[in-house]
Amino acid sequence: ELKGVAAENIQARVRGVFLMAYSNQLGNLMICTGNKSENSVGYFTLWDNCGGMSIIGDLYKTEIFDLCYWINENYGEIIPLEIITKIPSAELAPNMEDEKSLMPYPYLDAILKQELEWEYFSIEEQKEIQALIDEVDPKEHARMLKLLDRAEFKRQQSAPIIRIHPRAFGNGRKIPIVHKC
């Protein structure tokens, strides 16, 4: 009998298979909803992150929240506030919250920006990013970097990403799938 994460991931994989079949039947392209924060650290289930294109795959989670607020401010409440303010969760187990498994997204995104795209930020932006990173426990910081390194094999199997940032996964950043971390 499967237990824990292995059992939880069955639900996500079945959902992916169902959605791909439904998309196929309708003759439509399935869109992957993964984002750069989750993709970076492998916080997704293989074969649940399927699709023909990942529209928001190069946006950090904090950027997605900002984009949602911007859309609502400029076009009316298209995205219900309950969706934006809902605690992020993979919803594979009761009371599951992304930030309990990882860390609050502003801190995670700061670590990822430093690791992936540091040279593309202005000095002022780098100071803001560094200020957030300075608040992170060094062990948690190291854990996030380890997750980043270990997730390459998952990213290689994900839907193609529309590149927004200077360094997107895929063509913008390639490292061996298997390497010593």
What residue spans do the PLM features occupy?
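ATP/NTP-dependent adenylation/nucleotidyl-transfer catalytic domains that generate, transfer
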Residues: 1-181
